[in-house]
């Protein structure tokens, strides 16, 4: 992708939708499960290469069709009854889990909890003509899954309908939805999928309209200086977990062929990413700045707290859009308190130790407006 765009790999941000009804790409886990010379790995790598090739070809073609941009508008609208926090505090101090489908009434009917209720939209214009719209919203994007069919789910349905009705190319990004689901309002059936899609589409339309809930920012491209357009990155050094279910020796025993496949699969994913960290892998957070618009791209499944932190640390007149689900090998990460909570789900699939300070430092570094420290940031 970087070669096709004529840039370097640190200037590429690749985010996933995370809708669950889709393949997981994890070559390290496949190697551990099936071996280096296995047909499964060969097919896995072939599929990955095909995705990379088709995406790169599309990038090459797009460079032949560049169009001028005269202004960029940042707007937002509140989403009605879609998202709710997955971690539901209980009277005894424990944390209950409100999954994407929740049958237990007391958990399902609890208050929404901490979310970011706003869907944010970036609209790129050539004169009065809309060229493309990017939408950002923080929730797990699935209503139901596991029936062996690939689906773009409710968010994809909303995006597709928005594109059809507007005639404008639409892109949807999942924000920091690690601890946010549709479980309060979703019954896990086709009717609920349709309802969630309808509510998301309504927010997209309101955010895109002239009477949007909030026209937050307009960038006049002609007034920009070269220094007003920046791409920067900051490292997030996730740490290996080796306690409890993440113990390397325990994971080795769980990879035994006699173990149930789901046990082996989990052990392979845990072991594969843990080894990547031991080998020195460092994840990156990136930020595109165009005038007073900042677009942040984060790895893994970040908690909504980090999206809200980004909005707080940015200067007052900035319009902030945050996309999660970049490098997803780390799975979940959130406030350090999740590691001492009683109950909850996300920390059982967090492949990093406490990292709140590191993530907040990366966001602060990317979102300040002063001169950026050269050892941490590379501007392109």
Go through the PLM ranges and name each one:
Residues 1-380:
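Non-catalytic substrate/cofactor recognition surfaces at enzyme active-site rims
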